[in-house]
Amino acid sequence: MPNPTNEELNVATWKIPNALGIIGSSANNEFNGMTASWITQVSMEPLLIAVGIDNKSITHGLMSASEYFSLNLFSENYTKVFVKFSKPAEYKEGFLNEEPITLTENNMPIFDNAIVWFEMRKKETYDLGTHTLYLGEVTDCKTVESDARVAYMGDTRMKYGGVPRGGH
């Protein structure tokens, strides 16, 4: 069987249906939000969610330095937020990149426009090459709109996955 080309690998992996979310992180009074698409539940008891984070990202540094992080999911009709957080975030009290946030008791940003959010305690980390897999145990969550569908990669023009290409 022949080896697939990088283009074939990219096109194939972009077909994997991934939810889009914003990972909220903070450490040492620095805050960030980052668009993420590698998100999945991996255990029911304890309730664990895994997220894949680029090792070169600001979020990776903050998550490595903190015990907690958040996952914020948005409506399929509110996808502009993901473009805002494809670059490092600017924090102004109560806002990240002009998106309103509320800080939890653990100082993690929760996005006010999220339709579902989770706060998680970091349980395990696995360095897997270009990315680190963070396992978080859910400590708090809220569903704001139970009937709304959360956004996924197909709701945007974003493509993330496959093999490294220009700029990554």
Region roles according to the model:
Residues 1-168:
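Basic, polyanion-binding surface patches
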